[in-house]
């Protein structure tokens, strides 16, 4: 898969700042991929339903080379940090 970066967050909503950070990481760190990891249940935050946030990220990164999204997971009943999703 090459050199990858992991970009986790609530993305509520995903916005240009998120895209700029991910684009900068992709180019400045010479990454092959940036994997976006929307947090299913943010810690100490209320957020839009995970399904909606996941779809918003998918739309935002569509047609952007080097970006992909972590496979959709079932929403947890407890709060999590993005890193816990990967473990």
Specify the residue positions occupied by each region the protein language model found.
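Nucleotidyltransferase catalytic core that binds NTPs
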Residues: 1-87
């Amino acid at each position: 898969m090459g050199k990858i970066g992991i970009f986790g967050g609530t993305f509520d909503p995903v916005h240009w700042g998120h895209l700029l950070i991910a684009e900068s990481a992709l180019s400045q760190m010479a990454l092959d991929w940036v994997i976006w990891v929307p947090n299913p249940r943010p810690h100490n935050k209320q957020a839009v339903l995970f399904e909606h946030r996941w779809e918003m990220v998918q739309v935002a990164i569509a047609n952007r080379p080097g970006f992909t999204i972590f496979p959709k997971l079932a929403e947890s009943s407890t709060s999590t940090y993005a890193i816990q999703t990967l473990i």
